[in-house]
From Swiss-Prot:
GO terms for cellular component: plasma membrane. This is Sensor protein QseC. SMART domains: HATPase_c (SM00387), HisKA (SM00388). It is found in: Cell inner membrane. GO terms for molecular function: ATP binding; phosphorelay sensor kinase activity. It comes from Salmonella typhimurium (strain LT2 / SGSC1412 / ATCC 700720). Its main location: membrane. Member of a two-component regulatory system QseB/QseC. Activates the flagella regulon by activating transcription of FlhDC. May activate QseB by phosphorylation. The keyword Ubl conjugation does not apply. Keywords: ATP-binding, Cell inner membrane, Cell membrane, Kinase, Membrane, Nucleotide-binding, Phosphoprotein, Transferase, Transmembrane, Transmembrane helix, Two-component regulatory system. Residues 183-235 form the HAMP domain. Signal peptide: none annotated. The gene is qseC.
């Protein structure tokens, strides 16, 4: 098995072809041999019967002593006919030879048992013969006609060889044609292998499936899809690395500055405590940024959701509002939940949908002024998170949800990734997210399906 796996496809197909042809040729030869020998035996048995009946029509009463026909040279051949392959003799009822052909007939032993065909040997000879015994019309004489079995077999072999030899001669030409066809049909695969060998890892150009056999075309299409996914993943990774490096540069620089301030504060405890407080806040911001970067990276690598379940959005929103209640109270913001629909069920990943709702609520609380109200409303085909703040300028609204985008002049710290995470989770669940200014005032996010 290991040896055949190391062989090329062309060699394996050629070997299979040769094996199949050899088996077919052997079976055909065997069948042809059996059919030919049966036909030859039937033909020659018929000739022996006719010959014996001709002899029985002679006037055998004139035979008084053993006689023989005119002697002919041994094995006189006319074409492919051996004249000593056929012999006859006539015996009396008591086994006395009365007439023979002057050649092999005189060596036929008298072994009459009944009329019909029988096999036997000539005197002092090891070659098997086919004999036909026949009684004369008056029953006084025994006529025997014989033919050598080797002659029949040689005749059958000659007929079979004449039939199969052209096929045997044509076999090398068939093999040559097969090799040429295999070379032509496998040429697209060679080109495909060469294209893969010299393909750049960053290339997004699809493989050319022109001329590729239909059995291999699904493989080429699957490879093209794989290359497209790999290219998209590499683009995302590059963008993620670039964005992460850019966004982490500022917090890390701020941490370095606060560390230096703490070191330079000397014996001033107020300056040192202030610097350490700001350092702690900076570490929190950097930690939050790293967490969001890792979350977004994991979401980008997902194509299909795992561990999905049927989720009640009513329970999901209630749980999210309860979780955000204390941070909202500390910010002097009231969060209200209104259920305009019940028993709204969606299939999804529970943790991701919880993260989506939590990010929307966290964004609303972080950017709403104190004393604001955040309304969460569930409908049959959507849910809305809306605050009653000043809203967002139209020129800024078009950029909301982009990665690392933060409106200018913001006093609240953030990374600009929260709403990007929301949009990605919604996409994975077949939902759409829209951001805009509410008619009653304030900013709202609508998640619909």
């Amino acid at each position: 098995m290991k040896l055949t796996q190391r062989l090329s496809l062309r060699v394996r197909l050629t070997l299979i072809f040769l094996i199949l042809v050899s088996i077919t040729w052997a079976i055909s030869s065997f069948v042809a041999w059996r059919k030919t020998t049966d036909n030859v035996d039937e033909l020659f048995d018929t000739q022996l019967m006719l010959f014996a009946r001709r002899l029985s029509t002679l006037d055998l009463n004139e035979i008084n002593a053993p006689q023989r026909m005119a002697h002919t040279p041994k094995k006189l051949k006319h074409g492919h006919i051996d004249d000593d392959a056929l012999a006859f003799a006539i015996f009396s009822a008591d086994g006395k030879m009365l007439l023979h052909d002057g050649d092999n007939g005189q060596d036929i032993p008298y072994r009459y048992r009944r009329e019909g065909f029988d096999n036997g040997y000539l005197k002092d000879d090891n070659d098997l013969w086919r004999f036909l015994w026949l009684n004369s019309a008056d029953g006084k004489y025994r006529i025997v006609v014989g033919q050598e079995w080797d002659y029949r077999e040689d005749m059958a072999l000659a007929i079979v060889a004449a039939q199969l030899t052209p096929w045997l001669i044509a076999l090398p030409f068939m093999l040559l044609i097969l090799l040429l066809l295999l070379h032509r049909e496998l040429r697209p695969l060679k080109k495909l292998a060469q294209a893969l060998r010299f393909r750049s890892p960053e290339s997004e150009t699809p493989l050319d499936a022109k001329g590729v056999p239909s059995e291999v075309r699904p493989l080429v299409e699957a490879l093209n899809q794989l290359f497209s996914r790999i290219h998209s993943m590499m683009v995302r990774e590059r963008r993620f690395t670039s964005d992460a490096a850019h966004e982490l540069r500022s917090p890390l620089a701020a941490l370095k500055v606060q560390t230096e301030v703490a070191q330079l504060s000397g014996d001033d405890p107020l300056s040192r405590d202030k610097a350490l407080t700001q350092l702690h806040a900076g570490i929190d911001r950097a930690t939050r940024l790293v967490d969001q970067l890792l979350t977004l990276s994991r979401l980008d690598s997902l194509n299909n959701l795992q561990d999905v379940a049927e989720i009640s959005l009513e329970e999901l929103l209630q749980s999210a509002v309860m979780d955000i209640y204390h941070p909202a109270q500390q910010a002097n913001i009231d969060v209200r939940l209104q259920l305009n629909a019940h028993d709204v069920i969606r299939t999804g990943q529970p943790l991701l949908l919880s993260l989506l709702v939590r990010n929307l609520l966290d964004n609303a609380i972080r950017y709403s002024p104190q004393g604001s109200v955040v309304d969460v409303t569930l409908h049959a085909r959507s849910f809305t998170v809306r605050d009653n703040g000043p809203g967002v300028a139209p020129e800024i609204l078009t950029h909301i949800g982009e990665r690392f985008y933060r409106p200018p002049g913001q006093s609240v710290t953030g990374s600009g990734l929260g709403l990007s995470i929301v949009r990605r989770i919604a996409t994975l669940h077949g939902m759409t997210v829209s951001f805009g200014n509410a008619a009653e005032g304030g900013f709202e996010a609508v998640v619909s399906w």
